[in-house]
């Protein structure tokens, strides 16, 4: 397999070299065209992207203006990190404006020493940075009923990957001295609906983070400024934004967003609740729905894979609708609970092809097909969909959802 990867790259490079050689004839004209005719834009206090870059989030508004979601343009992304400005958003009751100088995090309930901490108090504590994915529990939710998503953004865009900086929650819980019998932490946000989620104490003491930074700067208001709870590998809704209260209890709160919402109604009429962990998932981002290949030739298929259970171990790609699979190359480093980019050199011969990816994580869990997922869970749920996504590359190079 390694030899075939090297051969594919050499073929691509040879084609590129030939194109460059032909382009040398117009070198002087190109140099003249690329010379700026003015001094350009002045220095500014905050960096802006080039006006030639057009990638934006796709926004889906709910019934009220305070609620809604916006989807990351995954097909336009490079590497594995999502710019903060393109990170997906999901709001249930607006985005509050919070003065960090007035904000407090209260840790109370079944503890010996309740604490009220300012943002500056938290920033003075030993901090860590962690690269991790956040994925909304409802990401790809429409795929349960029908795989009608026309492109990656609208089918898979409620997921993003950032570097987060903050303080270990375990450190704070050791300071308050959790009392005997406490087994849950009720996290509450400072938004208008005071959104709450119940978190098992074991998770809080494991890898939970009280974050104040994202991608090298302070959290943005839409991402929970000034403080956010981060729970690696768990559905986005549990990562409570605008965090202001952590209450230790001996039972879950049974809040709306962990009973009526973010639960999975099964075929037998029973519901799975507290289904926190997001399972292994992947999607090809190029070529994908809405894109066009200019003609037959060699291309690099690429996409993203992630798992709430740790590292991605393997990604396989099919170009014949699942009849055969080839192992893709994984970009290093492969981090737990983070995006892993995969690549495979592929020759498009001008005939119709149906492509998809399938991820396997370090636990051995294999991403299922939609049919395999529905056979177990039915179609009553709108959450936790991680089935494979198939794209159809037509003979003319256009790419569409293979199942529409």
Predicted regions span which residues?
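Structured, non-membrane catalytic/scaffold regions adjacent to prosthetic-group chemistry
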Residues: 33-404
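N-terminal secretory signal peptides
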Residues: 1-11, 18
């Amino acid at each position: 397999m390694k030899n075939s990867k090297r051969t594919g790259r050499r073929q691509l490079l040879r084609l590129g070299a030939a194109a460059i050689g032909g382009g040398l004839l117009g070198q002087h004209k190109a140099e003249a065209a690329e010379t700026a005719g003015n001094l350009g834009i002045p220095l500014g206090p905050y960096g802006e992207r080039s006006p030639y870059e057009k990638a934006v989030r796709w926004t889906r508004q709910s019934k009220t203006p305070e609620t809604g979601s916006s989807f990351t343009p995954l097909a336009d992304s490079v590497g594995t990190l999502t710019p903060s400005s393109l990170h997906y958003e999901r709001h249930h009751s607006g985005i509050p404006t919070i003065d960090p100088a007035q904000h407090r995090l209260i840790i109370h309930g079944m503890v010996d020493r309740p604490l009220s901490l300012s943002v500056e108090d938290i920033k003075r504590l030993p901090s860590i940075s962690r690269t991790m994915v956040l994925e909304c529990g409802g990401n790809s939710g429409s795929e349960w009923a029908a795989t009608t998503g026309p492109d990656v953004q609208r089918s898979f865009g409620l997921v993003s990957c950032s570097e987060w900086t903050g303080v270990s929650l375990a450190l704070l819980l050791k300071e308050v001295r959790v009392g005997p019998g406490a087994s849950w932490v009720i996290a509450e946000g400072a938004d208008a609906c005071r959104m709450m989620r119940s978190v098992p104490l074991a998770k809080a003491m494991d890898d939970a983070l009280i974050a104040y930074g994202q991608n090298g700067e302070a959290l943005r208001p839409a991402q929970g400024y000034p403080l956010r709870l981060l729970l690696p590998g768990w559905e986005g809704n549990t990562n409570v934004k605008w965090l202001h209260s952590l209450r230790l209890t001996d039972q879950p709160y049974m809040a709306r967003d962990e009973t009526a919402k973010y639960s999975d109604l099964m075929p037998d009429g029973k519901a799975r609740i507290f289904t926190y962990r997001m399972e292994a998932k992947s999607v090809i981002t190029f070529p994908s729905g809405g894109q066009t290949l200019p003609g037959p030739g060699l291309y690099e298929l690429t996409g993203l894979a992630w798992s709430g259970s740790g590292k991605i171990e393997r990604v396989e790609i099919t170009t014949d609708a699942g009849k055969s699979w080839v192992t893709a190359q994984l970009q290093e480093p492969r981090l737990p609970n983070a995006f892993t980019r995969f690549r495979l050199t592929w020759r498009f011969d001008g005939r119709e092809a149906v492509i998809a990816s399938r991820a396997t994580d370090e636990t051995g869990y294999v991403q299922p097909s939609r049919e395999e997922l529905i056979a177990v869970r039915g179609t009553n749920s709108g959450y936790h969909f991680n089935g494979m996504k198939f794209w159809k590359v037509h003979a003319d190079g256009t790419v569409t959802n293979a199942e529409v």
